[in-house]
Amino acid sequence: MEKEKRNQFLATGFFLFGIAFLYVPSILMVPTVIAQNAVLLKGIALVFLSIAAILVGTSFKDKQRIAVISGIGLAVGLSFLYLPVPSILSGSAFHILFACAIAFGMTTAAKQAAAIGSALLACIGIVFLYQPFFPALGGTALHLLLPGIIVFSIVFSQKTLCERISIGLIALGLIALCQPFLMLFYQTGFQLLLAGLTGFIVAAHR
């Protein structure tokens, strides 16, 4: 019981610090030193929010409430990504989607629906990655691909298949980065590699 309360306290702390590091550097009144290190602070924020999501998924008993909140968080992240919102919000979309995907995957009871939805989200991310008509959509592909892979790797019943898909993405990413012929394939190799590594790590430790 004490360990559970401690983890809940840590989850709250990591969440608050993550939010602070995510949004404080974008406020105009902050000192110059903080504003100059905004990228570093946002990187730390992603780590803190991810840790908070993992602790929330393991230490709180009301899994259904966490799943609903994190599902709303996913919707909010998508709205920040595609709706005309201030830059301080659009710049935080990836962090929100990444952290909420972890919490949602760990707590949702609708495993089958979540697996289908996350697979669809990842597929849309891949389509956005390679479509040549709207460059702005290509810039948001990783925002869809990683959360989709994370949720799918957690909720899908066949762990071995998740690992194989992830290994396939890793192989495709490496091939893309090593081949000199197709520039679009080369430019997207890192995203495929990152998605594959993320999916494999999540599937191996779920």
Question: What do these predicted ranges mean?
Answer:
Residues T12, L28-V30, A52, T58, ...:
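Long, leucine/valine-rich, helix-dominated scaffolding and oligomerization segments
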Residues I27-G43, F60-I66, F80-H95, A109-A114, ...:
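Membrane-helix interface and helix-disruption motif detector
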Residues F15, L49, G138-V155, T160-L177, ...:
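Polytopic alpha-helical membrane-helix bundles and their juxtamembrane interface segments
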Residues M1-K3:
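Short, Lys/Arg-rich, polar N-terminal cytosolic tail immediately upstream
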Residues F48-K63, C100-A110, P147-F156:
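Canonical alpha-helical transmembrane segments
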Residues Q8-L22, A67-G77, A115-G125, S166-L172:
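Alpha-helical transmembrane segments
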Residues F9-T12, G43-L46, S92, A115, ...:
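Alpha-helical transmembrane segments of integral membrane proteins
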Residues F17, L22-V24, M29, V47-L49, ...:
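Hydrophobic alpha-helical segments of integral membrane proteins
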